[in-house]
């Protein structure tokens, strides 16, 4: 046998032993840990994939962790506590700008609109963004996607986020709804199910959708470290296939059917409320038809980051986005 053939055989055996030794359970499924930025009905396609068994179909044993914030998700990803992160893609830009060699690469986009809503103390069917002038709003983390989209909308409507209103950015992600109930702020920016919960408790009323008023944006995407993508491409492809199946399901079924499927993920929320929230998201075309993260979307993301003063330099699309897995998942349908 030629030396090159021996080396090739040894390399294959080593790779097989590594994959077999640390990437499969006794049941033959590959364990993958996903850290999500929030546990929200906004990510319904992901939960549909979980509840309908699409991950198991693709050979994935998924562990889901709620990171409660993009900064925490990225920390888990970089440290190795998570294999895949679901968050705003701005986080991958920040890590890349810091000069990390094993940076996070976006491989599948899930949502194409913002998923949060502006909630007022009182009903206001005639709301306009101009009404925020001089008011106090509970916002999001500085340079996080929710806050940047909010400020992007304010600027579109002639408001300076720094001088025309007061934005409280100091409350932890996911705690703003509770804070709003005992706070004197005039408005809060909320994801579901918190926005609907405030309405049901008559403590707040949705007056605007940030998803509608901002337009199409690459709001949340799946990413993994460059090393993970190169070392475990089969797991990434299987994961992407499952997400694509989840997207296809939500785009071809009613809000009521989707709510029934994903309800185990939200035991504290009744099915009717889940259906209403899903309908709200479907009506504004929240979910993509496929997971391909287009260059135009990445350029728009960088425009938003530049406008927010959060971008030191524009970064190459080819470095931070790969469509290899998404294209294959789409073609496999």
Regions found by a protein language model. Name each.
Residues 27-160, 166-170, 186-192, 208-210, ...:
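Short, glycine-/small- and polar/acidic-enriched structural segments
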């Amino acid at each position: 046998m030629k030396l090159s053939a021996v080396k090739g055989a040894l390399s294959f055996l080593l790779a097989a032993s590594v994959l077999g030794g640390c990437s499969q359970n006794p049941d033959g499924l590959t364990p993958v840990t996903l850290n999500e930025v929030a546990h929200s009905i906004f990510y319904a396609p992901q939960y549909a994939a979980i509840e309908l068994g699409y991950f198991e179909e693709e050979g994935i044993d998924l562990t889901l962790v709620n990171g409660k914030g993009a900064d925490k998700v990225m920390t888990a990803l970089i440290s190795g506590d998570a294999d895949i992160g679901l968050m705003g893609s701005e986080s991958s830009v920040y890590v890349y700008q810091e000069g990390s060699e094993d940076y996070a690469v976006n491989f599948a986009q899930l949502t194409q609109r913002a998923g949060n809503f502006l909630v007022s103390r009182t009903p206001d069917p005639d709301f306009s963004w101009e009404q925020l002038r001089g008011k106090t709003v509970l916002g999001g983390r500085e340079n996080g996607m929710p806050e940047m989209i909010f400020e992007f909308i304010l600027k579109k409507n002639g408001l300076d986020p720094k001088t025309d209103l007061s934005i409280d950015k100091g409350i932890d992600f996911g705690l703003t709804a509770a804070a709003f109930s005992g706070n004197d702020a005039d408005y809060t920016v909320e994801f579901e199910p918190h926005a609907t919960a405030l309405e049901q408790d008559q403590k707040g009323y949705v007056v605007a959708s940030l998803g509608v008023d901002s337009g199409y944006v690459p709001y949340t995407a799946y990413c993994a470290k460059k090393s993970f993508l190169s070392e475990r491409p089969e797991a990434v492809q299987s994961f992407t296939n499952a997400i694509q199946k989840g997207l296809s399901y939500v785009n071809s079924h009613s809000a009521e059917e989707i709510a029934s499927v994903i309800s185990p993920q939200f035991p504290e929320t009744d099915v009717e409320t889940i259906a209403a929230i899903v309908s709200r998201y479907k009506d504004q075309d929240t979910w993509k038809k496929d997971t391909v993260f287009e260059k135009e979307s990445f350029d728009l993301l960088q425009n938003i980051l530049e406008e927010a003063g959060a971008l030191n330099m524009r970064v190459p699309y080819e470095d931070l986005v790969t469509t290899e897995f998404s294209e294959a998942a789409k073609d496999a349908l």
